[in-house]
Regions:
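Basic, Lys/Arg-enriched alpha-helical interface segments
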Residues: 1-67, 76-80, 87-122
């Protein structure tokens, strides 16, 4: 069963601003996520520690001399939502993950709030 993988609305313009090599590599691991869903593991995906969402994970890939991470989570519809990406090479890993997780948490919380609001409208 193929899994649905979506870009968060705020992530889409950020994705389009990335170098084409990074876009291609990200789409390749997103395809793996669509094929394997939550079963996708290392070296392509791993759990993010420190998130307020227990199901927050990261896609992992290398492109353009960088070590890229994309925070994502599966929502209640069982769809993977790609939230934010960043190159973790050349800097404080702790600071990188703190910033990545903060942005991912904010975006995923907003996504969940929108889903709840839509459900109430029905």
């Amino acid at each position: 069963m193929p899994w649905t993988v979506e870009f968060h609305d705020d992530f889409e313009p950020e994705f389009l601003a990335l170098e084409s090599a990074v876009q291609d590599a990200l789409l390749a691991v997103a395809k793996l996520l669509a094929d394997y869903g939550p079963q996708l593991g290392r070296p392509y995906a791993d759990t993010l520690k420190g998130s307020k969402h227990r199901n927050m994970k990261e896609l992992r890939f290398e492109a353009s001399d960088g070590e890229w991470r994309v925070a994502f989570a599966f929502d209640p519809r069982r769809q993977a939502i790609l939230l934010v990406a960043g190159d973790k090479s050349g800097g404080s890993q702790k600071r990188f993950y703190r910033r990545l997780i903060a942005r991912a948490d904010k975006r995923f919380s907003a996504h969940l709030d929108r889903l709840k609001a839509r459900k109430k409208e029905r």
